Amino acid sequence: LAVMTCSNYPAGYFNVYAEIAKLNDIDAALHLGDYIYEYPRDGYASQDAVALNRLVEPKTETVTLTDYRSRYAIYRRDADLQAMHAAVPLIAVWDDHEFANDAWIGGAENHDPATEGPFSARRAVALQAYHEWMPVRLNDPTKNDRIYRSFDFGDLVSLHMLDTRLIGRE
């Protein structure tokens, strides 16, 4: 397995995806969350984004379905990330930034209901975009916030994917 987490597009370092794509001795890539970050263009870890030509879209914080779709799309334009997705199966789980910083069951540190509406609406559109862009099969399509699943790699490893963020954190 190749394991990665915390993929902040403006900061760069997606070259690791190209290296994963070159590996011929792994069964899968495992992304442990923060596949995208919701911050606006001048937000967290963006100081080098202009020089690296890695400006996020939309330039605002992601809040709407269109925002989240655009953010996934800009990430997927990265040639190294495309190479990894083409070369190896991806097993993924979300953390907080697929929704908003420090998300929990009913809200997030980086969500203001007064200006961004109810967190439940943001959570719903973030979940929809996640499932549109990420290769995750649901055990129950009526419960898109339940991504518990298991993967067996022969008799060597049993990998159990858990959600310790959206439904596991109060």
Give the role of each language-model region:
Residues 1-170:
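Metal-dependent phosphoester/phosphodiester hydrolase catalytic core
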